């Protein structure tokens, strides 16, 4: 973005266009849509016609996926700024659908452009489908309008039109039934929350310690059973699980018993769990590491140092960085950073696994000497949320380089831009 500000699209036009045609977010559901930020890169630029032509040409072939959502969001922004070509492309795309499926792709973008008239026509078409097939599942009103219009206002207007339009009446009736079901579910959820203690007592009656110990040797038993038991068990029951772990040799049973301590706090580093943290079976080893990572013990620091120095350390073992959370010591940052910097991170998923665990360590240990680790996350991790947390730590430690502070003011993350604009 800083290049665009200083030099325009020179040398980067193809890169920016490619990012418009294919979503670049690691996970747009968590990070949010990047379309407004991308649009700002070419809005009003001399290259706008090229971008508009490419985006409009891609709309008819767009799918209900992240790339398609990104394209249609861009086209919607262009249309709202007066691009008739983009508006027509979205209209043609939506109205060409037969409305008999569960999803109306691009509906909310069309509503943002054409408002209530578009909603009325979509409701009429969906109501026609319902009248032809009473069991048909159609798109819900909330998804047709998203945030473009106020739900209650739209529902009121559709209800007013229903008296003179049988198709709209059918759609309104279906929506009323659907949202009534949601209301009943919400009430049921509240009742379930109120009955949490009753369900906990019932679970413990049905899963006493003897049943849990027996289930450890049962191939069909589920992880959830052991984790919930651990969250509810008394200390005597937890001690009995530890006793069983000390003599259990079956890896599958050991892993299940370790899951009892997933949400139960250990008061000390038990020798058997310490031993299992170096088990040959990955599942057992990982389960033990999750348990002991919440403890502070000199042995854990030494284990953590061994793990990051192991040439086999990779994104698959990134969770081992959590061993430092409560066991970090001076000099460890050098080993951690060396382990991170020798990773190839050619794959976004690998870079994310490492970046997520690394920034978690920064937020747990909160030591300024980890600034190099936070900088690695900022440079390497594709997740804007992780990069935001890295910058927050660097600011807290007064270690944010000036050039990165300048970059952050133009970052793809709304939150990071907002954070930096609060800083003088």
Feature annotation, model-predicted:
Residues 1-11, 27-50, 68-81, 92-95, ...:
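Structural detector for internal amphipathic alpha-helices that build alpha-solenoid repeat scaffolds
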Residues 16, 21-22, 55-59, 89-91, ...:
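Buried hydrophobic core positions in alpha-solenoid tandem helical repeats
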Residues 205-211:
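Elongated scaffolding segments in large macromolecular assemblies
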Residues 367-371:
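N-terminal accessory targeting/assembly segments
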Residues 237:
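Alpha-helix-centered segments that form part of catalytic cores
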Residues 329, 342-345:
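Short, catalytically relevant binding-site loops at active-site mouths
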Residues 408-414:
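TPR/TPR-like (Sel1-like) alpha-helical repeat modules
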């Amino acid at each position: 973005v800083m290049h665009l500000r200083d030099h325009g699209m020179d040398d980067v036009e193809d890169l920016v266009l490619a990012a418009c045609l294919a979503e670049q977010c690691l996970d747009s559901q968590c990070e949010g849509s990047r379309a407004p930020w991308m649009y700002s890169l070419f809005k009003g630029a001399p290259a706008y016609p090229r971008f508009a032509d490419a985006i409009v040409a891609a709309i008819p072939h767009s799918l209900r996926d992240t790339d398609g959502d990104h394209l249609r969001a861009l086209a919607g922004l262009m249309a709202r700024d007066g691009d008739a070509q983009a508006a027509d492309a979205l209209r043609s795309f939506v109205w060409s659908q037969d409305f008999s499926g569960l999803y109306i792709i691009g509906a909310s973008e069309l509503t943002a452009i054409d408002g209530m008239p578009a909603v009325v026509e979509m409701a009429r078409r969906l109501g026609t489908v319902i009248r032809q097939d009473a069991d048909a599942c159609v798109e819900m009103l909330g998804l047709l309008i998203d945030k473009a219009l106020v739900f209650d206002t739209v529902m009121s207007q559709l209800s007013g039109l229903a008296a003179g339009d049988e198709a709209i009446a059918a759609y309104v009736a279906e929506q009323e039934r659907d949202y009534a079901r949601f209301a009943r579910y919400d009430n049921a959820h509240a009742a379930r929350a109120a009955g949490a203690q009753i369900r906990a007592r019932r679970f413990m009656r049905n899963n006493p310690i003897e049943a849990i110990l027996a289930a450890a040797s049962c191939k069909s038993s589920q992880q959830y059973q052991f984790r919930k038991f651990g969250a509810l068990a008394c200390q005597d029951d937890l001690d009995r699980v530890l006793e069983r772990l000390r003599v259990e040799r079956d890896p599958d049973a050991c892993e299940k018993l370790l899951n009892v301590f997933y949400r139960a706090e250990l008061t000390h580093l038990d020798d058997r769990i310490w031993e299992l943290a170096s088990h040959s079976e990955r599942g057992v080893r990982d389960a033990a590491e999750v348990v002991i990572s919440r403890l502070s013990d000199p042995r854990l620091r030494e284990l953590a140092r061994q793990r990051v120095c192991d040439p086999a350390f990779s994104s698959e073992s990134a969770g081992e960085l959590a061993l430092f959370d409560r066991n970090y010591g001076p000099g460890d940052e050098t080993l951690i950073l060396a382990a991170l910097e020798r990773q190839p991170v050619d794959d976004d998923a690998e870079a994310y696994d490492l970046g997520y665990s690394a920034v978690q360590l920064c937020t747990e240990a909160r030591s300024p000497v980890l600034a190099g680790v936070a900088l690695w996350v900022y440079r390497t991790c594709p997740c804007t949320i992780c990069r935001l947390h890295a910058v927050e730590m660097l600011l807290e430690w007064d270690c944010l380089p000036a050039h990165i502070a300048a970059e952050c003011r133009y970052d793809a993350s709304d939150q990071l831009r907002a954070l930096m604009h609060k800083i003088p």
